[in-house]
């Protein structure tokens, strides 16, 4: 039983580390996108936003992906493009 608990704790620690890595990657990408958008002329910014929104609109999510997850992604992308990090 102790071995099972130790193994589960080890796996949990691994998952936590993976989660931290993913969070760091997302944060880095947010910073990069924000910096790029801020350094673009307004018309170039709008063109990028329109292209990203168009690409999102054309994507048909897999049926196994819950609608809530798809909507969460779309909302987050819109938020990032319209109101980049302060």
From Swiss-Prot:
The record describes its quaternary structure and partners as: Interacts with RssB.
Q: Where is the signal peptide?
A: none
Q: Which GO terms describe its cellular component?
A: cytoplasm
Q: Which family does it belong to?
A: Belongs to the IraP family.
Function text: Inhibits RpoS proteolysis by regulating RssB activity, thereby increasing the stability of the sigma stress factor RpoS especially during phosphate starvation, but also in stationary phase and during nitrogen starvation. Its effect on RpoS stability is due to its interaction with RssB, which probably blocks the interaction of RssB with RpoS, and the consequent delivery of the RssB-RpoS complex to the ClpXP protein degradation pathway.
Q: What UniProt keywords apply to this chain's record, in alphabetical order?
A: Coiled coil, Cytoplasm, Stress response
One biological process term from GO is: cellular response to starvation
Top-rank taxon of the source lineage equals Bacteria
Where would one find coiled-coil regions in this protein? 1-36
Q: In which broad location class does this protein mainly occur, judging by the first location in its UniProt entry?
A: cytoplasm
This protein's species is: Escherichia coli (strain SE11)
Q: Name one Pfam family in it.
A: Anti-adapt_IraP
What NCBIfam families does UniProt report for this protein, alphabetically? PRK10244.1 (NF007598)
Q: Where in the cell is it found?
A: Cytoplasm
The name this protein carries in UniProt is: Anti-adapter protein IraP
């Amino acid at each position: 039983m102790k071995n099972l608990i130790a193994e589960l704790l080890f796996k949990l620690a691994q998952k936590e580390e993976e989660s931290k890595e993913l969070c760091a990657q997302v944060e880095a990408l947010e910073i990069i996108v924000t910096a790029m958008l801020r350094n673009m002329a307004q018309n170039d910014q709008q063109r990028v936003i329109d292209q990203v929104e168009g690409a999102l609109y054309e994507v048909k999510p897999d049926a196994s992906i819950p609608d809530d997850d798809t909507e969460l992604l779309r909302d987050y992308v819109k938020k990032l493009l319209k109101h980049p990090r302060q």
